[in-house]
Curated annotation (Swiss-Prot):
Keywords: Carbohydrate metabolism, Glycogen biosynthesis, Glycogen metabolism, Glycosyltransferase, Transferase. It catalyses: Transfers a segment of a (1->4)-alpha-D-glucan chain to a primary hydroxy group in a similar glucan chain. The keyword Glycosyltransferase applies. Transmembrane segments: none annotated. This is 1,4-alpha-glucan branching enzyme GlgB. The gene is glgB. InterPro entries: A-amylase/branching_C (IPR006048), Branching_enzy (IPR037439), GlgB (IPR006407), GlgB_N (IPR054169), GlgB_N_E_set_prok (IPR044143), Glyco_hydro_13_cat_dom (IPR006047), Glyco_hydro_13_N (IPR004193), Glyco_hydro_b (IPR013780).
Length: 731
């Protein structure tokens, strides 16, 4: 049938050409129902269809093909009504479906305003792919609303297997100056793979994964997957208690885990039983996952994220990940995850140059690229980008009940000259090196999390002396809950790696951390970064033969658990893994049952005991962040490599911690203490239970009224070589 090009059911050639090439800002202006002076017209593009019938008023009408796979019909002058399209493709039964171009925009004006201002705190509910249900005159219509931010694009479309990846089938409409593109597609359900076909100003089509996708295909595939959740949480009591708890005065020992290599081949469902049981048995209060957001390259350990809103599909579905978190909560264990807002990879199907131009990344290469890592840096000063990141932090806490975010590479965000040579960075407006936009972002993120989710943690991996990392934002600080103490980690590992005969010359490396221990709210981290890239495992760093390595590692762990600050230990170190961590294989569990395995089982037993003593002793955790919780008893005995200090609880309890870091026992070591009475031995790393050498230490010691070391009382202690003892003052 030939249609007069001037007919009101046709589309002007200029608009038709733009629709054909998916670079029209308003496809809804031509597809769907339209009123003209000559009457009502309905048009639809159905690529490859042989016939399309309009179903309206209980009647079927054959629509006219007008070229370019477009079908149209003139309904004359009549009132608008609900309708369906019956589409026939070759060798297929006809399909009846609602018209995507019948529906009003799914994004409201207030949503657009909040996003443009960078203040939409539930951004995932309007951007990305959201399943929606509408009640119409002809019945319920269920489908997916797609929305993407691409302000520099000249056209956007939704593509997937449902339309043969043909961008002309489902072009999206522009939502004006907001930069948003939107389309509701009936019939698209959970599990459908899709991308956004973005037409750039240079005339190129770039198929992009959805930045807001809640699920992604398993790598190396790069598609996004429509997802919704039916998960029924069982942790309401946990969340209630979390909102009322200040962890500053609570025990916090964190087991850091790379989910893919804890035990090789395990998925979220397996881990919800095996990992949860293991962490609970050892007495940890929290677990911390290396990044679980979707990432294409396993060798990045998750630190080069392409899907910020999608748990990686490597180990299961989003709801299976929810069940893993829920299982930890059921055992009283909090869940922290590493979060990477500092930078993102250059993969051309992801965030990089999303709409053909710098969008998520800063447009100035001096601020928009991290050459050391080969990644791009977010444009923290752009409202929409800042909103994307702040909302992402909230998303993990709200949708997955995550208890804390450990923010990676904070130093790289704070300093404009981070890892840059002269001429490779631009000063801020005041001529300084501080990245003021990143500072504002971090303050906003931390303040928003605190306001909406009291009790949820934000933890900074920040390796410099930036002031006020954990100070409140209202006092000019960054507002983090906690900060990793990288100085303590470096100095302590350096000291323990020395042969005991040389340690006297490095005594200050062990004591210096107490100079600044209360300047921030610190976590003591022995993380994955310390057991890779040729650094060796903790076991490997300890000097001497097998017995001495085991004794040194036991003493190191006791020192860490008694030092002010919360604790974090990477998986494998709890049993003294001998080799470096490798993400491509599981932990060497067989070492515990193999030759000399008794040493490794003893270290794991000590880890369990340390967690128990730590959690049960207010003196070791209630005053981590104040000098009132600590005093030196002996900090200057470098000659004997002996340290001793007392930790004080907010309840008045006291724990004396004594360390002999030499190879020589001290059978009658005289030590001043603050209080008289009985001091009971609660932990001895040299005990037979831990395969120590000397087991004849008195289980309690009575303080004598003999002044020593500026204290009114003193103890005479047997302090074995390479060991630690904790003594609790009995009331």
């Amino acid at each position: 049938m030939t249609v007069d090009p001037a007919s009101h059911i046709t589309i002007p050639e200029a608009d038709l050409a733009r629709l054909r090439h998916c670079n029209h800002h308003d496809p809804h202006g031509f597809y769907g129902w339209h009123e003209t002076e000559a009457g009502s017209v309905i048009r639809t593009r159905q690529v490859g269809a042989t016939q399309v019938n309009l179903l309206i008023d209980d009647t079927s009408h054959v629509m006219t093909p007008i070229g370019d796979d477009i079908f149209a019909i003139d309904l004359g002058h009549r009132e608008r009504a609900d309708y369906r399209l019956e589409v026939t493709w070759p060798d297929q039964e006809p399909q009846v479906k609602a018209d995507p171009y019948y529906f009003l925009p799914t994004v409201g004006e207030m949503d657009i305003y909040l996003f443009s201002e960078g203040r939409h705190e539930r951004l995932w509910e309007i951007l990305g792919a959201n399943i929606k249900t509408y009640q119409t005159a002809l019945g319920t219509v269920r489908g997916t609303a797609f929305t993407v931010w691409a302000p520099n694009a000249i056209g956007c479309a939704v593509v997937g297997g449902f339309n043969g990846w043909n961008a002309s089938q489902h072009p999206m409409r522009s939502m004006g100056g907001s930069g948003l593109w939107e389309l509701f597609i009936p019939g698209i359900e959970e599990g459908e793979v899709y991308k956004f076909a973005v037409q750039t100003r240079e005339g190129q089509r770039r198929d992009k994964a959805d930045p807001m996708a809640r699920r992604a295909e398993l790598a190396p595939a790069t598609g996004s997957i429509v997802a919704s959740s039916e998960y029924q949480w069982q942790d309401s009591e946990w969340l209630r208690e979390r909102s009322q708890t200040d962890l500053a005065s609570k025990p916090m020992s964190v087991y850091e885990v790379h989910l893919g290599s804890w035990r090789w081949g395990k998925n979220y469902e397996d881990l919800a039983t095996e990992l949860v049981d293991y962490v609970a048995d050892l007495g940890y209060t929290h677990v911390e996952f290396l990044p679980v957001a979707e990432h294409p390259f396993g060798g990045s350990w998750g630190y080069q994220v392409t899907g910020y809103y999608a748990p990686t599909s490597r180990w299961g579905t989003p709801d299976q990940f929810r069940a893993l978190v829920d299982a930890f909560h059921a055992r009283g264990i909090g869940v922290i995850m590493d979060w990477v807002p500092a930078h993102f990879p250059k993969d051309d199907w992801a965030l990089a140059r999303f709409d053909g131009e710098a969008l998520y990344e800063h447009p100035d290469w001096r601020r928009g690229e991290q050459k050391d890592w080969g990644t791009l840096v977010f444009d923290f000063g752009r409202n929409e980008v800042r909103n994307f990141l702040v909302a992402n932090a909230l998303y993990w806490i709200e949708e997955f009940h995550i208890d804390g975010l450990r923010v990676d590479a904070v130093a790289s965000m704070l300093y404009l000259d981070y890892s840059r040579e002269h001429g490779e960075w631009e000063p801020n407006i005041y001529g300084g090196r501080e990245n003021l936009e990143a500072v504002q972002f971090l303050q906003e993120m931390n303040a928003t999390v605190l306001r909406l989710h009291p009790g949820a943690l934000t933890i900074a991996e920040e390796s410099t002396s930036w002031p006020g990392v954990t100070a409140p934002t209202w006092d000019g600080g960054l507002g983090f809950s906690l900060k990793w103490n990288m100085g303590w980690m470096h100095d302590t590992l350096e000291y323990f790696s020395k042969n005991p005969v040389h340690r006297a010359f490095h005594h200050s490396e062990l004591t210096f951390s107490l100079v600044y221990a209360f300047s921030e709210r610190f976590v003591l981290p022995i993380s994955h970064d310390e057991v890779v890239h040729g650094k060796g495992s903790l076991w490997d760093r300890m000097p001497g033969d097998t017995w001495n390595k085991a004794a040194g590692l036991r003493t190191f762990l006791a020192y860490m658990w008694s030092h002010p600050g919360k604790k974090l230990l990477f998986m494998g170190q709890e049993f003294g893994q001998r080799e470096e961590w490798a993400e491509g294989q599981g932990l060497p569990w067989d070492i515990v049952d193999g030759w000399q395995g008794e040493y490794h089982e003893a270290i794991r037993t000590l880890t369990r005991s340390l967690n128990g003593v730590y959690s049960d002793s207010p003196a070791l955790h209630t005053q981590d962040f104040t000098g009132e919780g600590f005093t030196w008893n002996k900090g200057d005995d470098a000659t004997n490599n002996i340290l001793a200090f007392t930790r004080f609880g907010s309840d008045g309890s006291q724990m004396l911690c004594v360390f002999n870091l030499s190879g020589t026992s001290q059978p009658e070591y005289q030590l001043g203490v603050a209080a008289g009475g009985e001091w009971k031995l609660v932990l001895n790393t040299d005990d037979a239970e831990f395969l120590g050498a000397e087991n004849d230490i008195a289980t309690s010691v009575q303080a004598a009224a003999t002044p020593r070391d500026n204290f009114a009382y003193s103890l005479s202690l047997h302090v074995p070589a390479m060991s630690a003892q904790f003594y609790s003052l009995q009331k």
